Amino acid sequence: MSKNIENHDSVLLLQDCIAGCKMALESMDDIREHTDDKQLRELIDKYYDEHTRLSVDCRDMLDKAGADIKEPGVFAKMAAKLQTAMKMAVNDDQSQAAKLLTEGCNMGIETISGSLNEYRDADSKSVAIAERLRTCLFYTSPSPRDTR
């Protein structure tokens, strides 16, 4: 283990963070395709950039530790893509896009919160990145009322 990552829990937490960032980025790409609302598009772009920065930070720490990068599960990626396509095909409005973003953020917050609880021995740098991701997810989630 590198001195940059103190223990195995830190690696596991960062791997969950990077997988979550990748899921979020793919979901935002999928939703952006169905979005013509300028305000919602700007929100997606802002948090897309933040998730990208978080992903790079995780990757850098994992690379320094010589740890593998975790990919989101194939089933989870396909299910998210299919859900977005189906829901937007039925109701292709900005409120639906905002709801999908909110649902994704809620799942991400749950997942990262669970990882923080599970990997209690993670070092402070890894925990700080996970907390940044959780905060980013919280603020990414738009209110459907804001897009009407």
Question: Which residue stretches match the model-derived regions?
Answer:
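Single conserved hydrophobic/aromatic residue that forms the stacking wall/gate
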Residues: Y139-R148
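Alpha-helical bundle segments that constitute or directly flank the non-heme di-iron/ferroxidase center
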Residues: K3-T35, Q96-R120
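Acidic interhelical loop/turn segments
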Residues: G114-R132
